[in-house]
Amino acid sequence: MEKKYKTLKAFYPYYLTEHSDPTCRVLHYIGTSLVILVLIWAILQPVWWKFILLPLVGYSFAWVGHFKFEKNKPATFIYPLYSLASDFIMLYHFLIGKIDEKLAEAKMIIAQENKNEL
């Protein structure tokens, strides 16, 4: 299957529109924040099993958000690296108070892409 998005910059608006539900985003923020904390913990006190916690912590929150609230499949299944990077970018935009602005921009970009595909 040919992937539509070739760059993270092109992918991120799509990623945001797949995270329109506020509860889904909050679950992603929790999961991504916990991943950061577990990573720091695993680096400071290295034990192999702590590194296994990283995907478990991150994906468990994200996937509950997608399947229960957003009602879609995680973009991770098709774009794993772009999705991982986008999790951190989305958390950053939330922390600096720009997530609503970025989500509105993303919706316009994706609407234009969809219009151009017709």
What are these regions (language model features)?
Residues L39-A42, G65-H66, F94:
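Structural signal for membrane-spanning alpha-helices in multi-pass inner-membrane proteins
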Residues L56-E70:
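Transmembrane alpha-helical segments that form the membrane-embedded catalytic/substrate-channel core
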Residues M1-Y15, K71-L118:
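Membrane-proximal soluble regions of multi-pass membrane proteins
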Residues L8-Y29:
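Membrane interfacial helix-start motif at the N-side
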Residues E18-R25, W49, T76, P80:
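Membrane-water interface of alpha-helical transmembrane segments
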Residues L27-W41:
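Core segments of transmembrane alpha-helices
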Residues I40-F51:
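Helix-coil boundary and interhelical linker segments in multi-pass alpha-helical membrane proteins
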